[in-house]
């Protein structure tokens, strides 16, 4: 958005964690992946404990130490504005500003639908907060953050979600028909409830709803793709189900879908809301994803299939009530912020 619409502004994208210490970045990324895959409850506990107390203090102290190395880069680049989409980056920059080492404006973009206090460390030195919805804005205000620097713009998404797609052409490419409901099923994640539950839920859709078309995206997960394809073959549904690997056509597929089945990550959720898609939530990792799931369920946008839920029962209820999906779609419109990226840029640069 910046490079396309604000030609006089120089932009540089930097992974501050890799810059500060690539070894720590690799260790923390690997640890998160292993916990999310094998012991998601452990990540959930770390997430909760890092709100306040000893763990939050340790995190804050380590970010102050790492900020010293980041200072070298910031002095070299001397930016007018720093935009951060991670709490650690925001903390490091606000600490340097507090110590009068930098004078840059700082904009923090919170990338989930529930607040976490790690985002707010050093808030008095942050100039802009961009949040997903008004309740988050009210939470920040309750933490004594000046409401004039909080904007409920939504989480930034690709401008491809602003395009008008020819739905008939997209359906035709898939050999689908426009007079049937289409479900977009993201099953490539390797975290959360894992492969077994995901495959069980996919099988429910295939067996329960023969008149529904399904676009199943397995991503880079070969085992998931194989499992999906096997079910499709067994149920003789090759005519109305497409099992795909990684795709760059998410905006197009969302434009022709009536429902999305997905993990509730901040970006995918924002894209679904921009596309006005009701959601079936699967596999949320304890922590921010579970908080996202709770928010979406409470706002009548999503059905959350939990670990011990009967997916057959949940999905039967979803499709047996003719008013439920239309009502969920109406609810998405209340939180849809498809111009989030453009509005953030206008606030920062106009």
Model features per residue range: what roles?
Residues 297-300, 307-324:
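C-terminal "capping" alpha-helix adjacent to the active site of nucleotide-linked donor transferases
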Residues 4-76:
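Conserved N-terminal ligand/cofactor-binding loop architecture of enzyme catalytic domains
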Residues 127-190:
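A nucleotide-sugar donor-handling region in carbohydrate enzymes
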Residues 337-350:
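C-terminal alpha-helical cap of glycosyltransferases
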Residues 74, 102, 118-128:
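A conserved, positively charged/aromatic
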Residues 324-338:
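A short, well-ordered alpha-helix in the C-terminal region of glycosyltransferases
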Residues 249-291:
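A donor-sugar binding/catalytic signature common to diverse glycosyltransferases
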Residues 169, 176-256:
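Donor-nucleotide binding loops and adjacent catalytic segments primarily
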């Amino acid at each position: 958005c910046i490079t396309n619409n604000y030609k006089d502004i120089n932009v540089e994208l930097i992974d501050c964690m890799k810059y500060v210490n690539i070894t720590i970045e690799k260790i923390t990324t690997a640890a998160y992946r292993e916990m999310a895959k094998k012991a998601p409850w452990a990540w959930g506990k770390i997430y909760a404990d890092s709100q306040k107390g000893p763990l939050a203090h340790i995190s804050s102290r380590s970010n102050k130490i790492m900020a010293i190395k980041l200072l070298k880069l910031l002095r070299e680049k001397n930016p007018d504005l720093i935009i951060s989409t991670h709490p650690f980056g925001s903390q490091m920059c606000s600490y340097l500003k507090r110590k009068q080492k930098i004078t840059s404006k700082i904009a923090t973009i919170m990338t989930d639908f529930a607040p976490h206090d790690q985002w707010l460390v050093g808030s008095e030195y942050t100039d802009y907060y961009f949040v997903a919805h008004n309740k988050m804005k009210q939470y920040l205000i309750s933490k004594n953050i000046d409401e004039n620097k909080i904007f409920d713009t939504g989480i930034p998404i690709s401008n491809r979600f602003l395009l008008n797609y020819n739905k008939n052409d997209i359906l035709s490419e898939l050999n689908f028909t426009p007079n049937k409901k289409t479900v977009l099923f993201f099953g490539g994640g390797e975290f959360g409830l894992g492969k077994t539950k995901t495959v069980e839920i996919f099988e429910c859709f295939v067996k329960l709803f023969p008149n529904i078309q399904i676009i199943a995206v397995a991503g880079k997960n070969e085992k998931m793709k194989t499992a999906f394809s096997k079910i499709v073959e067994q149920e003789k549904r090759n005519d109305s189900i497409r099992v795909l690997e990684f795709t760059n056509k998410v905006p197009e597929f969302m434009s022709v879908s009536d429902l999305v089945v997905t993990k509730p990550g901040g970006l995918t959720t924002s894209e679904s809301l921009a596309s006005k898609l009701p959601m079936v939530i699967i596999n949320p990792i304890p922590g921010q994803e579970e908080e996202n799931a709770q928010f979406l369920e409470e706002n009548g946008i999503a059905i959350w299939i939990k670990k011990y839920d009967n997916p057959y029962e949940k999905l039967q209820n979803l499709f047996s009530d003719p008013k439920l999906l239309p009502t969920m779609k109406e609810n998405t419109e209340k939180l849809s912020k498809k111009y989030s990226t453009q509005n953030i840029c206008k606030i920062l640069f106009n």
